[in-house]
Every structure is written in C-alpha cells, then in structure tokens.
C-alpha cells in the first residue's frame, strides 16, 4: 500500500519534480559533507580572513591527547616501574619508530640518528592519532584535507633537503645525475630527476589525503544506504539491509587498519627520503 501511494505521488508531480526531489535529498546527505571545514571563531585582520575552524579544533585536541598520554605514562607524570596498558602502548610506539629509524637510515652513528628521531616520532604519533580520531562518529578527519597533508609533507621535505645540503654540501646535487650517464643525456636526466624529486613531497601528501578521504566516503555511502533500507519498514528491505550492514562493519575494521597503515607508510617514506638525502642513494 505504501508503495502504491509513493508511485501515485511521483506520477502526479512529474519526472522533473522527482529528479529535483532526489537531488535535494542526496545533496543534503552528501558523503563529502563530513569533510566540510566550518568556522567556529571568525577573525578578520584587515582584508585577511582568519578563523578557528573545526579542523583546528581537532588538531589541537589530537596534540593535547598525545601530550597528556605521554605525560601520564612518564615517571614524572605518574608512570609506574611495572608498565600499565597505556604505558605499554607508548613504549610500543616508541620502540617501533626507533627500530624504523635504525633500520631505514644508514651511514650515521646512533647519536646522530637520535637527532632525527624526535621529529619522526612526533610525526608518526600525530598522524596515527589524527587518523584514529577521525573514526570516531561526529568527529573530523584532519588528514582528509589536501592542504593539511600537503603542508605537512612539503615542510618535512624542505627539512630533508636542508639536511642533505648540510651533510653533503653542493655534492648533494649529484643526487640528480646518476653516474655513467652520457653527457648529451645529462640535461634531460637532471630535469627528470629534479621533477621526480619534487614530486616526492606531492605524492607523500596526496597518498595520505586520498586514502583517508576515499575510505571515509565509502563508509558514509554504505552506511546511508544501510540506514535507508532499515527505515523502509519492510521485511524484504530489512533482510536486504543485513548485507550492507556487514559490509559497513567490515569496511570500518578495514579503515582502522588503513588509519594505522597510512601513518606507517608516511613515516617510513620520510625515513627513506632522509636516507637518500644523507647517503645520496
């Protein structure tokens, strides 16, 4: 009976009105709506517009959470000689990143590697917690925005380039010209290597942004589809809803893995690029 009234209603208003109806319905529940940056505290300085947004809020919350967690598990902040669960988690992250730095960066003594370790540890921890808090309902995924990931990747990439010049001087430019290249091909290879080197920073930011945005969008689409079928008040639709519901649960678990994996991939690529800049590989 409900389907009959729906069919009669749509036949009376016409196909054009139906298309507008569904367009308005879908636009109000767009899967990209979760990535909207909303100003919380608007600020104007002359012709420049600044504002404290939801993205800024969740970045501050992530940093605060990391600082509180580290302070809590240290001895000064109340850590125990016998580690509890939180202390074990921080030690696990610390040892994981330390082993990553020791394995991927060669040609340096342990003391010199320790100079790079804090930056790499903070980067991994920040990205890990940003990705994980984006899985919480009604939160905001900071790493799903291209400008944020691109700003992070370019700032780290500039720092790696500076380290390369500090360690090797102008000999660092030999990284752009492989040994044994014929002289006529040298200008073309230098240009190609320079473009490839600069695109490292771009690909580093795009990879993180694209994976986080695509995964969250897919979960949102399937969640909306499952919820729509669940609200149909029909046994057929309810049974058909179980399939999308299980897929949503599986994708949520997959997204948790992707959140951890992307923080790892971002960090290991930083170590590889830093090793290339130091050892000119």
UniProtKB/Swiss-Prot annotation:
Family: Belongs to the ATPase A chain family.
Keywords: ATP synthesis, CF(0), Hydrogen ion transport, Ion transport, Membrane, Mitochondrion, Mitochondrion inner membrane, Transmembrane, Transmembrane helix, Transport
UniProt-recorded Gene Ontology molecular function terms: proton-transporting ATP synthase activity, rotational mechanism
Entry GO CC: mitochondrial inner membrane; proton-transporting ATP synthase complex
Membrane topology summary: Multi-pass membrane protein
Assembly notes: F-type ATPases have 2 components, CF(1) - the catalytic core - and CF(0) - the membrane proton channel. CF(1) has five subunits: alpha(3), beta(3), gamma(1), delta(1), epsilon(1). CF(0) has three main subunits: a, b and c.
PANTHER family: ATP SYNTHASE SUBUNIT A
Record function comment: Mitochondrial membrane ATP synthase (F(1)F(0) ATP synthase or Complex V) produces ATP from ADP in the presence of a proton gradient across the membrane which is generated by electron transport complexes of the respiratory chain. F-type ATPases consist of two structural domains, F(1) - containing the extramembraneous catalytic core and F(0) - containing the membrane proton channel, linked together by a central stalk and a peripheral stalk. During catalysis, ATP synthesis in the catalytic domain of F(1) is coupled via a rotary mechanism of the central stalk subunits to proton translocation.
Name recorded for this polypeptide: ATP synthase subunit a
Compartments reported by the entry: Mitochondrion inner membrane
Membrane spanning stretches: 50-70, 116-136, 145-165, 172-192, 219-239, 246-266
Database matches in HAMAP family: ATP_synth_a_bact
């Amino acid at each position: 009976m409900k389907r009959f009234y729906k069919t009669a209603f749509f036949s009376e208003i016409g196909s054009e009105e139906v298309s507008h109806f569904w367009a308005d319905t879908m636009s109000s529940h767009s899967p990209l709506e979760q990535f909207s940056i909303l100003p919380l505290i608007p600020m104007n300085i002359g012709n420049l517009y600044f504002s404290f947004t939801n993205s800024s809020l969740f970045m501050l919350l992530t940093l605060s959470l990391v600082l509180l967690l580290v302070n809590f598990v240290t001895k000064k902040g109340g850590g125990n000689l016998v580690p509890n669960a939180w202390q074990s988690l921080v030690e696990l992250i610390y040892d994981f990143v330390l082993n990553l730095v020791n394995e991927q960066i060669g040609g340096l003594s342990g003391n010199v590697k320790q100079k790079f370790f804090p930056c790499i540890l903070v980067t991994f921890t920040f990205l890990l917690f940003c990705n994980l808090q984006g899985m919480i309902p009604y939160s905001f995924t900071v790493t799903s925005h291209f400008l944020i990931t691109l700003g992070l990747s370019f700032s780290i990439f500039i720092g790696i380039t500076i380290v390369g010049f500090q360690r090797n001087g102008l000999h660092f430019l030999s990284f752009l010209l492989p040994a044994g290249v014929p002289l006529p091909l040298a200008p073309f290879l230098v240009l190609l290597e320079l473009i490839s080197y600069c695109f490292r920073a771009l690909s580093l930011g795009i990879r993180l942004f694209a994976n986080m945005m695509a995964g969250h969008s897919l979960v949102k689409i399937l969640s909306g589809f499952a919820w729509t079928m669940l609200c149909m008040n029909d046994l057929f639709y309810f049974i058909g809803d179980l399939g999308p519901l299980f897929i949503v649960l599986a994708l949520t678990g997959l997204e948790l893995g992707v959140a951890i994996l992307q923080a790892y991939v971002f960090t290991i690529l930083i170590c590889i690029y830093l090793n290339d800049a130091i050892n000119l590989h």
